[in-house]
UniProtKB/Swiss-Prot annotation:
NCBIfam families: PRK06654.1 (NF005175). Its main location: membrane. This is Flagellar protein FliL. Controls the rotational direction of flagella during chemotaxis. It comes from Borreliella burgdorferi (strain ATCC 35210 / DSM 4680 / CIP 102532 / B31). The lineage of its organism: Bacteria, Pseudomonadati, Spirochaetota, Spirochaetia, Spirochaetales.
């Protein structure tokens, strides 16, 4: 006796059309083409990224920020320089310690006459702030002059009452091995 399942067997009748099968085949083809396109674009992006990195590294271009020209920055303000702070000596935090010798000048606005008297009265405290700053650094840390200027300027301005220092000029920085 034949099973009931035998009635559902496909005998290969070619007259039966399968409309539902055509639409998924088209969608699958479109998805395949999209996947290949996305994969190709991703590979192109990755390759161009690495090629550009190689070109930049071989060109010898510095990776630091560019130095701006004077035309772009404008003229600096006219300052009066207080240069009465003596040479400051001390030891760094290096092991073994190194000796530093520092001399600097403090620039302030030319229209501020009160700050000159205050700088004269605070001279001992200013020397102590500067000596303490350099004594808390290693010889390697002392090499970043722009950071040194900004930090010392902030420390000095925190104690001044009659104005502020606009700029610091490091006229001498020497570090000696002991």
């Amino acid at each position: 006796m034949p099973n009931k399942d035998d009635d559902n067997l496909d005998m290969g009748d070619s007259n039966v059309s399968r409309k539902g099968g055509l639409l998924p085949d088209i969608i699958i083809k479109i998805l395949q083409i999209l996947a290949i396109g996305i994969f190709t674009v991703a590979i192109m992006i990755i390759v161009s990224y690495f090629v550009s990195k190689m070109v930049v590294s071989q060109s010898g271009a510095p990776s630091d920020f560019p130095v701006f020209s004077n035309e772009y920055l404008g003229k600096p303000p006219m300052l009066i320089w207080y240069e009465s702070i003596d040479e400051i000596r001390g030891n760094t935090l290096d092991v073994p310690p190194k000796t530093f010798v520092v001399k600097l000048a403090l620039g302030y606005a030319e229209n501020n006459v009160n700050i000159l008297n205050e700088l004269g009265r605070q001279k001992v405290r200013l020397k102590d702030i500067i000596r303490e700053y350099f004594s808390q650094r290693t010889g390697q840390e002392i090499k970043n002059e722009s950071q040194i200027k900004a930090e010392i300027k902030a420390r000095i301005n925190s104690i001044l009452r009659n104005g502020e220092i606009k700029e610091i000029a490091l006229t001498q920085i020497d570090i000696f091995d002991m």
